[in-house]
């Protein structure tokens, strides 16, 4: 029994020893494997870290650094100032920003506003829901870049070169043959552009467009300049109460966002006043905004009817406008296009364009100005819900590389099919724009159009509320998984029924268009000339005589003509739209008219 017990004990000890050796072996092998693979794991981690850094470098953030204000109008067009958004500035106005952030954090109870009240629509708060509770002055916005090519003027950044070119192009009426003789130097550059296929980048640019509506702390110190820096050689009289600064008078405003490495700069140009944050309103720069709207987007100085006050004196007679006058009005120093050129010049004084990627963006009027500025200097431009600016581009004779396709212009227009201003249908006697005093008669855009078809996809109806940048960001862009596809604009022509003339002896006016409204039932006179040979024995000579025969012919018509058919063109209307005078475009005032009473 004792031997048997010892045998079982030895057997148990051997099994324990075997298990022990097995465990030790496994642990040893595991340690060896970990030790061997440590180097490869470290290399993989380093590679992953590099890839993450590349991703973060591709997706940087933008933050508001400067605000530029350029005065316009006859009084303040020489006024130009800059406000730097520094940490000291943010600390100085911390109570205001705290209050503003609380206001933006609260749910907005939007009052019921009729879609035909444009002024109240503009006065609504338009800060996007996605950024509620964030300070517009310190918000950081992500973005991504993409590689692209740009063809632009070599001397575009030379002082006064662009202005001299535009003056020369205006003097020669934009004649392409003459412009080609001066042999402009075009260069091809590899540049960085916003990645318009990335939804976050598009939202960022739209937010910058919305940020341009933001008002700054409006206290007495700010009114008297305090933080503003004078630019240029003109310093207004600070004791003159008629000269206001910043937001308080007519002018153009640009909010400048800069990346952390100072390599990317985005200029957000303010659109039509009224669509601001709490504390804003249509009384900021609304009057001058409307003047520039009507100058840029109407056929002839907002000449809709004799009841309208035109913004310039270029109208001559029914559907006839002076082209030279229009071009000079757009280039005046107190208008927005000249102001945006000078604003860009002052931005490039801080951020040299040779070493900085400069983009421009804006909403509505600001988007159109961004497109004009981008085409002038060859900058990438992204516009949101902008009216058609092709007509203004041609009137300004902006430089365009010969043969450059639209997809290489680096201009993108984002819009939706339910916005009547973007679609160019907010016109006519009963339209909301006309009732509010806006002559939005243009439809055609330059560059690429990126259109969200919300009418088909969401069943929306055309409504001015869909023009707001807040609606565009929260209810359109963020509700789609991808950004809208961008495509070249279809063939388009604005103001086809207008005749633009130039009072220059060396310049031929546009020929009169054939009148399709002439009544086909009127009798016409046709003159037939025949040569008849006749023989004469007088003096033995033969002579030929020409007989002119005039006959009256009438076209064959199944309908019996009346004695006095009414003309087909309305030349004069009452204020409520009733036509009181009929005639033709080429008729005199006292001939071929029909009065309806």
Curated annotation (Swiss-Prot):
EC number: 3.1.1.3
Highest taxon in the source lineage: Eukaryota
Membrane topology: Single-pass type II membrane protein
EC class of the enzyme, as a word: hydrolase
UniProt catalytic activity: a triacylglycerol + H2O = a diacylglycerol + a fatty acid + H(+)
One Pfam family of this chain: Lipase_3
The protein's role, per its UniProt record: Lipase which is essential for lysis of subvacuolar cytoplasm to vacuole targeted bodies and intravacuolar autophagic bodies. Involved in the lysis of intravacuolar multivesicular body (MVB) vesicles. The intravacuolar membrane disintegration by ATG15 is critical to life span extension.
Subunit structure: Binds to both phosphatidylinositol (PI) and phosphatidylinositol 3,5-bisphosphate (PIP2).
Stated name of the protein: Putative lipase ATG15
Organism: Candida albicans (strain SC5314 / ATCC MYA-2876)
């Amino acid at each position: 029994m004792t031997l048997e017990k010892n045998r079982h004990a030895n057997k148990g000890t051997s099994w324990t020893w075997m298990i022990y050796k097995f465990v030790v072996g496994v642990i040893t092998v595991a340690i060896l494997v970990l030790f061997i693979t440590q180097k490869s794991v470290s290399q993989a981690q380093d590679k992953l870290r590099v890839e993450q850094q590349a991703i973060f470098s591709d997706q940087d953030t933008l933050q508001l650094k400067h605000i530029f204000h350029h005065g316009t109008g006859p009084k303040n067009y020489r006024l130009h100032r800059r406000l730097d958004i520094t940490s000291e500035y943010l600390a100085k106005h911390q109570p205001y920003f705290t209050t503003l952030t609380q206001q933006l954090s609260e749910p907005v109870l939007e009052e019921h506003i009729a879609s035909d009240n444009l002024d109240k629509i503009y006065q609504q708060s338009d800060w996007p829901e996605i950024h509620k509770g964030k300070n517009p002055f310190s918000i950081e916005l992500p973005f991504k870049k993409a590689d692209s090519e740009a063809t632009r003027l070599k001397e575009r950044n030379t002082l006064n070169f662009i202005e001299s070119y535009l003056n020369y192009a205006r003097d020669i009426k934009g004649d392409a043959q003459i412009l080609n003789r001066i042999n402009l130097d075009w260069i091809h550059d590899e540049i960085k552009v916003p990645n318009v296929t990335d939804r976050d980048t598009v939202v960022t640019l739209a937010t910058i467009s919305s940020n341009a509506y933001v008002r700054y702390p409006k206290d007495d110190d700010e009114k008297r300049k305090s933080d503003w820096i004078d630019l240029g050689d003109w310093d207004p009289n600070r004791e003159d109460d008629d000269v206001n600064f910043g937001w308080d008078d007519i002018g153009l405003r640009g909010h400048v966002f800069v990346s952390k490495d100072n390599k990317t700069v985005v200029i957000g140009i303010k659109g039509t006043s009224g669509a601001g944050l709490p504390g804003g309103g249509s009384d900021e720069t609304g009057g001058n905004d409307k003047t520039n709207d009507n100058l840029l987007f109407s056929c002839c100085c907002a000449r809709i009817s004799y009841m309208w006050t035109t913004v310039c004196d270029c109208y001559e007679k029914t559907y006839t406008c002076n082209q030279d006058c229009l071009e000079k009005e757009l280039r005046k120093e107190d208008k927005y296009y000249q102001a945006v050129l000078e604003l860009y010049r002052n931005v490039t004084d801080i951020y040299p364009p040779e070493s900085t990627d400069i983009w421009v963006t804006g909403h509505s009027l600001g988007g159109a100005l961004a497109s004009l500025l981008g085409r002038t200097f060859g900058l990438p431009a992204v516009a949101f819900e902008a009216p058609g600016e092709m007509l203004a581009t041609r009137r300004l004779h902006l430089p365009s590389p010969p043969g450059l396709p639209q997809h290489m212009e680096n201009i993108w227009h984002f819009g939706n099919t339910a916005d009547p201003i973007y679609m160019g249908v907010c016109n006519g006697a009963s339209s909301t724009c006309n009732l509010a005093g806006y002559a939005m008669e243009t439809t055609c855009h330059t560059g690429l159009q990126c259109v969200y078809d919300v009418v088909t996809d969401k069943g929306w109806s055309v409504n001015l509320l869909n023009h707001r940048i807040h609606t565009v960001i929260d209810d359109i862009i963020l509700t789609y998984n991808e950004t809208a596809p961008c495509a070249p604009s279809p063939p388009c022509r604005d103001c086809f029924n207008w005749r633009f003339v130039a009072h220059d002896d060396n310049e031929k006016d546009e020929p009169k268009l054939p009148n399709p409204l002439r009544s086909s039932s009127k009798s016409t006179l046709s003159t037939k000339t025949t040569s008849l040979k006749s023989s004469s024995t007088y003096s033995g000579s033969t002579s030929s005589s020409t007989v002119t025969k005039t006959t009256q012919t009438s076209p064959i018509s199944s309908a019996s003509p009346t004695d006095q058919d009414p003309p087909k063109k309305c030349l004069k209307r009452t204020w409520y739209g009733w036509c009181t005078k009929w005639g033709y475009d080429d008729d005199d005032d006292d001939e071929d008219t029909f009065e309806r009473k």
